[in-house]
Amino acid sequence: MSQPQDRDRRRLISASLAAGGLMAGGSMLSIEAGAAAKHKINMQLGWLIGGNQLGEVVAKKLGYFEQEDIDFQIQPGGPSIDGVAIVASGRFELGQVSSSPSLMLAVSQGLPIKCFAVGIQKHPYCFFSLKKNPIRNANDMVGKKIGIQSTGIILLRALLAKNKIAEKDVTIVVAGADMTPLMTGQVDAFTGWQTNTTALNVLGDQRVDMRLWDAGVKLYPLPYYATTETLAKKADQLAKFLRATGKGWEYAHANREKAVDLLVKEFPNLNRKDELDAAPVMLDYAFNANTKANGWGAMDPAVWKEQIDLYAELGQFSKRVPRVDEVMTLEILNATGAARPRIG
C-alpha cells in the first residue's frame, strides 16, 4: 500500500477555482425523493489509487453502489493534480485527502468545501526508530536527527509544540520516502504511515513506532469532503455513497483476502502480497471502539477543534482561522447512522 502525499500547503488555491458561484446553501439536510436514474459520483483522490480505497473498490465490485442507484468512479490524484481545487470547482462530486489539515487550510483560504466523514479513525502517520536507539515518546526526540519528507515538517513542528519541545532541540533532515537513512544511521527516526507495510519491511523486528496521534497531535486521516453546495443540494446522494462505502468496508473487515482479490482485480498494477500485508493494518484503523459505538466513518467535532487550535498556534492560517462548523458537518453521518457498520 502506498503512502498518500497531499502537499497540504501547495496549490490549495488554484487561480481557476471557479468557486465564485459555489455559495453555501441552507444548513438543513436536503433529501431528494427517489430518482430513477443513477447518480454519477466521482471521488477525486489526492494520490494514486491503492489499498486506502479497499472499501470503495469492494462496494463497487459487489454492487453496493448500484443498489443505491450510484454510478461510482474513483479519480486518481498524483503530484500534478490538485484534488481539493478540482472538487471545489464543482468538476467532481466529492473527494478524499490524506489528512484533515488540507481541508482546514483550504477552508481558511475561502474554498467552499466541508468534511462529512472520515475513512479511518486515527492517523497512521508515525515516527519509526530502531530498538538499539528507540524513540518511544516525544521527549525521546530531544537531541535526535529526524528524517522527514518536506510535506511532513509541519507535523513534526505540531508534535514538538504539543509537547512543549523547542524546535532547536531536534535536527530535521529532509529526505525522501526510502528508509535507508534510518537503516544506515544517518537519522535516528524516519517518518511514514504504518499502513505502508511494504516500505516498512526493511526494518524487520527492530522497528519501534511512535504514532503522531499518541504523541498528542490528533489529525483525521482520509477525510471525505464535498462542496457546501453539494452538501446542501445533493445530501441524499452523499448519504447513499456513505451507506454503500460503509458496507464495502464491513465486507473487507470480514473477508480480507477476498476484498484484496477484488482490489487487485480492479487495479492489476497493485501487488497482491503487499496489499494482503497492508489490509489488516488499514482495517484496524478503520474500525475501533469509536466505530463500534458510532458507526464506520464517525468523527468528533472536539478533535477538529483541537487540531484547528493547534494549527492556529503554529501560524498556519495565513488569512483567518476557520470555525469547526465551517470545516466539518455531522449531517450526512446522522442521516446514515442506522446503516453504517458498528464494528470495533
Task: Identify the residue ranges that each predicted region occupies.
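N-terminal export signals
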Residues: 11-32
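Periplasmic-binding protein-like
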Residues: 119-129, 201-231, 242, 280-285
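Conserved C-terminal helix/tail region of periplasmic/extracytoplasmic solute-binding proteins
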Residues: 304-344
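A residue-level marker of the well-folded mature domains of exported/periplasmic proteins
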Residues: 74, 171-172, 180-189, 200-209, ...
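Residues that mark the N-terminal boundary/hinge immediately upstream of a DNA-recognition element
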Residues: 8-9, 137
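Secondary-structure end/capping motifs
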Residues: 232-316
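Secretory targeting signals
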Residues: 1-7
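Short, glycine-/small- and polar/acidic-enriched structural segments
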Residues: 36-184, 188-194, 205, 210-211, ...
